[in-house]
Amino acid sequence: MAGRGSRLRPHTLTTPKPLISFTGKSIVQRLVEDIVAICDEEINEIAFIIGDFGSQVEKDLKKIASDLGAIGTVVYQDQPLGTAHAILCARESLKGNVVVAFADTLFKADFKLNKKNNGIIWVSKIEDPSAFGVVKIN
């Protein structure tokens, strides 16, 4: 959640992109609810990695976690140094099974987690991948 949402202006001038409401719920709330629904284990903590969005955003994110019976942890990424750095900033929360998701991406989590695998990456095939990271599969 550390990005600025420049492509959704003017909406993101006052609201961070993941907190923009989409049919009554914020994008991040929908994402978190979908992920919690596919997890077979109890979710104890939901960590949100954010830039400098302010205390109201912290409260909103903690409420999303609380409403799902989890502790909401807010971690700050002070410099926009990429996804790996953002995850590193949240290293204290990386215990046990972990799901990493982009808070501004809408998708329906209609899959199941397979605990037999050490790691899983969910990807989507798109026509023009030039603006994205690319995953090659066999």
Model-derived regions: residue spans:
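Conserved N-terminal catalytic core of the sugar/cofactor nucleotidyltransferase
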Residues: 7, 21, 25-106, 111
